[in-house]
Amino acid sequence: RGLNPDNPVIRGTAQNPDIYFQTREAVNNYYDALPEIVEEYMGKISKMTGREYHLFNYYGAEDAEDIIIVMGSGADTVRTVVEKLNAEGKKVGVLVVHLYRPFSIKHFMNAIPASVKRIAVLDRTKEPGAFGEPLYLDVRAAFYASDRNPMIIGGRYGLGSKDLVPADVVAVFDNLA
């Protein structure tokens, strides 16, 4: 049960305040490198499976004016509605987030068609007292430094395992118009 060199164990590690800040900041370069590394491996997975994955996958009209940004379980429902609405002649799309943290503004902005005028960001969380939910705030921040200025609204879905149904997605697009 005691410590010995043949069976090393570590528990309850701590860093003293005199170096904690520096060690937390020292990892920034590793986090900054992650989007490119993940994108590279997603490319390898795509070659093996035939399914194309990126940090952000866009589906919909190339000249969409209205898009929904979503991640997680609601993405398939939104994509199904986007396909139906596009078949009816509407110009809509969905941006599916696959790597949320670290948030790559470069990859994010490159994935959104230049024609987009209105964006609904759907989060599957509620942040009481906050200006908005996490994904919504990151999307707003990404456009802040851009010369593009679409209208961006936030919304939420799926709290308490409530299903996101196609009628909900249609209502989001109707609200954007």
Regions found by a protein language model. Give the residues of each.
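Short glycine/threonine-rich loop-to-helix capping motif typified by GTGT followed
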Residues: G72, E83, F103-A114, E133, ...
